[in-house]
Swiss-Prot record:
InterPro entries: SmpB, SsrA-bd_prot, SsrA-bd_prot_CS. This is SsrA-binding protein. Required for rescue of stalled ribosomes mediated by trans-translation. Binds to transfer-messenger RNA (tmRNA), required for stable association of tmRNA with ribosomes. tmRNA and SmpB together mimic tRNA shape, replacing the anticodon stem-loop with SmpB. tmRNA is encoded by the ssrA gene; the 2 termini fold to resemble tRNA(Ala) and it encodes a 'tag peptide', a short internal open reading frame. During trans-translation Ala-aminoacylated tmRNA acts like a tRNA, entering the A-site of stalled ribosomes, displacing the stalled mRNA. Pfam families: SmpB. Residues 139-167 are annotated as: Disordered. The gene is smpB. It is found in: Cytoplasm. Belongs to the SmpB family. One of its GO terms (cellular component) is cytosol. It comes from the Bacteria. Residues 139-158 have a biased composition (Basic and acidic residues). GO terms for biological process: trans-translation. One of its GO terms (molecular function) is RNA binding.
Length: 167
């Protein structure tokens, strides 16, 4: 007896599940364009990611010889990892993008001074995808302004809720 497909799968919708987020990227950079990239991973890395042992906070993407690599992201191997391979937690991982996207990113990084920052790692139909963003660094006063704006929005919502409740 076969299982009935769920409503989401029957309609062709792709289910995504977030593995890791880089919240610090939103705080430290002005994020502009976002790209979805595949990752060239080894078997032990997939198992470790399924166990939730990935961290992209310290990672960044780097263009080397016309290809983009993820550097500094950590995937901690499981204890049961294979004995015939030596797992390296912070190895360089190749990002899989279309050639046109790579060329576009390459020109923006080299000429305009942008940085490639990983923002999210997630599952997309049984494949691990990485969202990378073209970003420019924030100055300290920009970070303070963003914090003030966030506090003001929170206070404004609080006042509106209180006013609507009293009315």
């Amino acid at each position: 007896m076969s299982k009935k497909p769920t409503k989401d799968k029957a309609n062709g919708a792709k289910a995504t599940k977030t593995i890791a987020l880089n919240k610090r990227a939103r705080h430290e950079y002005h994020l502009e364009e976002r790209y979805e990239a595949g990752l060239a991973l080894q078997g032990w890395e997939i198992k470790a990611i399924r166990a939730g042992r990935a961290n992209i906070v310290d990672g960044y993407a780097y263009v080397r010889s016309g290809e983009i690599y993820l550097i500094g992201a950590q995937i901690t191997p499981l204890i049961q990892a294979s004995t015939h391979t030596v797992p390296v937690e912070r190895r360089d991982r190749k990002l899989l993008l279309h050639r046109a996207e790579i060329d576009k990113v390459l020109t923006r990084v080299e000429r305009e001074g942008y940085t490639l920052v990983p923002t999210a790692l997630y599952w997309s139909s049984n494949k691990v995808k990485l969202e990378i963003a073209l970003a420019k660094g924030k100055q300290n006063h920009d970070k303070r302004d963003a914090a003030k704006e966030r506090d003001w929005q929170r206070d404004k919502q609080r006042v509106m809720r209180r006013h609507n409740r009293d009315a």
